[in-house]
Amino acid sequence: MNNLIEKIIWILTINFMLNACSSVAKDPPKPKNSRINKLDSLLTISEPEAKAIGKRIWINECGGTIEGLTSWNKGEYFASLGIGHFIWYHRIKRGPYEESFPSLVRYLVSKGVNVPEFIFNKHCPWETREDFVKAKNSPQMIELRNLLFSTIPLQTEFILLRLENALPKMVSAISIKNRSKVQSNFYKLTRTAKGKYAL
């Protein structure tokens, strides 16, 4: 089983590295406070890297559209937001997945981003998918999309931080003899933009 997990990780990594995305989608704007960023980790990502990687993720995950940054899939009971499909639950119905949107909001605030007041609410303001769809063109939804579009590079940083924070758990699922090698290879991949994108 451990070998299977290791093989899957390597296949996915190689696949992502080999499949470069090409698109003519408009570049997301860089945040006002952009600069070369040292993440709160062992990872470093430059502003151009964060922007380019974020654009690729945005195209792959959201179709390169601003509307694609806010979604709520049929059969689910949570909003899926941003390039990382960050989950945001309503207070009434929680789920088995880790809620990641509030953590993203805290990260954005720590980077000096002004976020709309309603986002500071601990829970998603839309109770159901139907409520969410009805609010498609509401001022709140437009404000949310604008925030998500303007922070694509910061979302990229946040995705990498979450991945690095999950590394110990991922490594614990493989054989002890391969753990240091996999961890070393993880950080080798983070030294290049293509490696960061693959991760």
Predicted regions and their residues:
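Bacterial N-terminal signal peptides that target proteins for export
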Residues: 1-9
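Cell-wall polysaccharide-cleaving catalytic domain and substrate-binding groove, primarily
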Residues: 22-199
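Bacterial N-terminal signal peptides
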Residues: 10-19
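Intrinsically disordered, low-complexity segments enriched in glycine/proline and serine/threonine
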Residues: 9-10, 64
